[in-house]
Amino acid sequence: MCLTSAVAAARLTAASSATAPRRTARIASNSNARRGSTTRLNAVFTPPDPTKVKPLPVRIGHGFDLHRMELLTEMPGLELWLGGIKLEHDRGCVAHSDGDVLLHCIVDAITGALGMPDIGQLFPDNDPKWKGCTSDVFVTEACRLMREAGYEIGNMDCTIIAQRPKISPHKDAIRANLAKMLGADESVINVKAKTHEKVDSLGENRSIACHTVVLLNKV
């Protein structure tokens, strides 16, 4: 190695050694800063107060839910409920309550529009009193909060995602039941169904899911 190359190599090594500790210290400092700024969350759940909802002209909420489905031959007693309507199928939903994904995501859409806690906080699955509960109970409570906050259903659009069973033969019954449950006109409730093209757990009929978007109008 020529003298010039040797000097350059020595300078590069010295520069690397000098900068490495500073880089490490800077990373550690940032890490400590993050740890130091962590805020401990309050584990005590405070029930929502409808009177504190800001009175906007309209509010929009989105809800999503998914439940695993198992064969009735493997888990007898399971059932498949959608929008408060029982569907005959060779599989049923595994859930703490009745596993009605449509009603569950409607609850989340309504409470989400109001800026309130989700269904898991309002009706926790570790509370035995909700074990096997029919989901219309949850919808009734969400509607109570909505009305006490001074709102009504303006429009609701639901999309059920399931490979089987076919939802189309049941859509009218589901829609009518939702309108009755929500105290809304059928014309503002829409129910759609999509398959998942045999992809992942939804497409393999091992789960069922639903999305709901709701528009709330100030009364």
Per-range role (PLM):
Residues 191-195:
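Pyridoxal 5′-phosphate
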Residues 185-188:
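Short acidic capping loops at alpha-helix termini that bridge into adjacent secondary structure
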Residues 44-177, 181-182:
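RNase III-family endoribonuclease catalytic core
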